[in-house]
Amino acid sequence: MKFVDRFRGAVAGMLRRLVVEAMGVALLSALIGVVGSAPAEAFSRPGLPVEYLQVPSPSMGRDIKVQFQNGGANSPALYLLDGLRAQDDFSGWDINTTAFEWYYQSGISVVMPVGGQSSFYSDWYSPACGKAGCQTYKWETFLTSELPQYLQSNKQIKPTGSAAVGLSMAGLSALTLAIYHPDQFIYVGSMSGLLDPSNAMGPSLIGLAMGDAGGYKAADMWGPSTDPAWKRNDPTVNVGTLIANNTRIWMYCGNGKPTELGGNNLPAKLLEGLVRTSNIKFQDGYNAGGGHNAVFNFPDSGTHSWEYWGEQLNDMKPDLQQYLGATPGA
């Protein structure tokens, strides 16, 4: 009888977990469009010295569009990385914020790679095949080798001592770039990212989101969930490296409660609550490992929305300038 009771309990527990996981998958599928496509119209005002570069990428076999604002000769760079539904015309940072205005004459060069939908700014194992066809995704190689070399040679921008800031999908991407390229990225900003992708349902949720966004497959990126690439690209697993590198971290995640800034819609509220747990988990690991070079902003408000990410980018500007040694007005 005890065996039967235990068996029934185990089955009931398994069913509960399956229901919860199914609800999570369904929820993410319904919500992931919250950072969806915006009009093909850049926000930056006329008169700002914004350039539209076509940077050769031998690794991806094509030129990559990059929006760029020069901060002066030998200035550090701020790489702004986009969300899951990154467009091919303009960066979401330019469409949805006044980032170029905020950082004009800051002494920091602003670099916005365009495109890379669902890429996680990673080097994929296989071609990225989606609804629009197939292409090669070698974004880590581009961001850490091809692009900085181009900017150094053509725009006199420092290839080291720079920052990577990403939102949503790119929150973990920015952290991963800093983990493996610490000389280039001494400062990293993560906003509302899912920071434990290898954990439990992480691979399934990411695969579902990528499929919904553009028909992409997570296995083409990092292989099956058992592949080491999932842990290799997990900031929470590798938090010790960030601590050892003494990387400066600025991390933000709201709790799903809107403020007067906006984002008062159900998808934005629920999705922010969904990713907050992984951010707190990262913070716990960072503190437990003795980390002491981070700013954690986890307010009792904020939704998965550009209004909050833009505010954070503006707020971190003095910290960025000081840490990168920028010379304002250059």
Curated annotation (Swiss-Prot):
Which species is this record about? Mycobacterium leprae (strain TN)
One Gene Ontology cellular component term attached to this UniProt record is:
extracellular region
Q: Name the segments for region: Fibronectin-binding.
A: 100-110
Give the location in the cell.
Secreted, Cell wall; Cytoplasm
Q: What is its EC number?
A: 2.3.1.122, 2.3.1.20
Q: Which Pfam families match?
A: Esterase (PF00756)
Q: Which residues bind substrate?
A: L84, R85, S168, D196, L274, V275, R276, T277, K281, H304, S305, W306
Function in brief: The antigen 85 proteins (FbpA, FbpB, FbpC) are responsible for the high affinity of mycobacteria for fibronectin, a large adhesive glycoprotein, which facilitates the attachment of M.tuberculosis to murine alveolar macrophages (AMs). They also help to maintain the integrity of the cell wall by catalyzing the transfer of mycolic acids to cell wall arabinogalactan, and through the synthesis of alpha,alpha-trehalose dimycolate (TDM, cord factor).
Specify the protein name.
Answer: Diacylglycerol acyltransferase/mycolyltransferase Ag85A
Please list the reactions this protein catalyses: an acyl-CoA + a 1,2-diacyl-sn-glycerol = a triacyl-sn-glycerol + CoA; 2 alpha,alpha'-trehalose 6-mycolate = alpha,alpha'-trehalose 6,6'-bismycolate + alpha,alpha-trehalose
Q: Which keywords does this Swiss-Prot/TrEMBL entry list? A: Acyltransferase, Cell wall, Cytoplasm, Disulfide bond, Secreted, Signal, Transferase
**Which Gene Ontology terms cover its molecular function?**
diacylglycerol O-acyltransferase activity; trehalose O-mycolyltransferase activity
Subunit structure of this entry?
Homodimer.
Which residues are the signal sequence here? 1-42
Q: Which gene encodes it?
A: fbpA
Which family does the record claim for this protein? Belongs to the mycobacterial A85 antigen family.
- Where are the disulfide bridges? C129-C134
Question: Where does the record place the catalytic residues?
Answer: S168, E272, H304
- InterPro entries tied to this protein: AB_hydrolase_fold, Esterase-like, Mycobacterial_A85_antigen
Question: Which Gene3D superfamilies does the UniProt entry name for this protein?
Answer: alpha/beta hydrolase
